[in-house]
Amino acid sequence: MIITILIAIFVIIYVRKNISQAKIAEAEAKSKKIIIDSEKNAEAIKKEAILEAKEEVHRIRNDFEKESRERRNEIQRLERRIIQREELLDKKSEAIENKEEVLNKKQQDINEKAASIDELYDKQREELEKLSNLSSDEARELLLEETKKEIRHDLAVMIKEMENKAKEEADKKAKEIISTAIQRCAADHVAESTVHVVSLPNDEMKGRIIGREGRNIRALETLTGVDLIIDDTPEAVILSGFDPIRRQVARIALEKLIIDGRIHPARIEEMVEKAKQEVENDIKEEGEQATFETGVHGLHQELVKLLGRLKYRTSYGQNVLKHSMEVAYLAGLMASELGMDPTLAKRSGLLHDIGKAVDHEIEGPHALIGSEMAKKYHESSVVVNAIAAHHGDVEYESIEAILVQAADAISAARPGARRETLEAYIKRLEKLEEIANSYEGVEKSYAIQAGREVRIMVKPEDIDDYGCIEMSKNIVKRIESELEYPGQIKVNIIREVRAVEYAK
């Protein structure tokens, strides 16, 4: 059994060995075939690569030859252009040489002619000096003087044209802003009286007001500081005094006494005290109402009281509080038209005349007094400057200051806003005509439009058109320095030339 197994094992080993050898032989045969095929493929690839390399070399050689031909052609073209330019330059050079020769000849001719002209000029100058009895220096001075006159004339024309253009543009813009502001500011107040008239129920009341031996009227005048004028006017007593607040106190006290009927010194003193308290309350209320209506908030209480006191002040008959409110409206509206914040402009306008509430108690111009009061109560520097500068006492430091000055002038110049005494009015008109007539060449002058315009007729043979311009400026300067007036005064110079001939 074991032998059989061993024989079987040997047989299996032998068979496997033969099979392995057969597979090895087959693999070797395949390897050789693969090697042979690879060698054949490598040879083919080598030949193909050599062929491609030869084709690439041929292509490169052709491209190089083509590029070389193109470069040679370009070089030849450039050479031809250079040759053409050289020929052109030669021609131009020849032409320039010819022109230089011609110019040299012309220059020589010019020099010869210049020499002859100089010689002729010297002869003519000598002849002119003999004929005119003027030396060359004198003639030069005369020529310079004539030239100066011509330049001055041209300069005056240019200045006039520029002034007219600037005035047209400025007037147009200013009129737009001011007209818009005025249209939006509906001012309905008129000039107010500076005296008070108290009506009486009958003429017998006059005797009771006077009292025994005049003690009642003396007590009332002493306590109020106001003069009582009792004359033949029926059923009326006139109160006259320097201080409008005192007049108001006297009016209220007198009206209360008339209603009460008991008029004696003790009762008068009691009523005067009540009237003073009533006026103080009214002053505060008026100040607060003014700030409310104008939209100006945050004022110090003392400034509010001073505003209220302006109700009892007038300037040329115009109520100062109403005027201040109108200036605030106008300044604010103009600031809005200019694209600015109207708050400061309105505040400055409302306070611009605050100094008039105290200027009879403190010495100095009301503008500077008002600015000091505003500064004392912590108003901004813009407001302080606007108050101080609205009459030109100091320089403007802001646009708001200029707007306040303009609004003040508009409010004051509005027809019916202010009035003057007849005597001051007549004196101002006479002074206007006197200033105009003081200039040489003035034929006559008229102050018209209630003193807001002076019309001047000049002699045309003495004053030319440009002299009129100079005269108008000089007259304006004198009016501004010598006269005091509300608003503005127009100086209108008229020069008329007439030529008359008669046909026979």
Curated annotation (Swiss-Prot):
The keyword Signal does not apply. InterPro entries: HD/PDEase_dom, HD_domain, HDIG_dom, KH_dom, KH_dom_type_1, KH_dom_type_1_sf, Ribonuclease_Y, RNase_Y_N. One of its GO terms (molecular function) is RNA binding. SMART domains: HDc (SM00471), KH (SM00322). Pfam families: HD (PF01966), KH_1 (PF00013), RNase_Y_N (PF12072). Gene3D superfamilies: Hypothetical protein af1432, K Homology domain, type 1. Keywords: Endonuclease, Hydrolase, Nuclease, RNA-binding. SUPFAM superfamilies: Eukaryotic type KH-domain (KH-domain type I), HD-domain/PDEase-like. Its EC number is 3.1.-.-. Residues 320-413 form the HD domain. One of its GO terms (biological process) is mRNA catabolic process. Residues 194-279 form the KH domain. GO terms for cellular component: plasma membrane. Belongs to the RNase Y family. NCBIfam families: HDIG (TIGR00277), RNase_Y (TIGR03319). PANTHER family: RIBONUCLEASE Y. Endoribonuclease that initiates mRNA decay. This is Ribonuclease Y. The gene is rny.
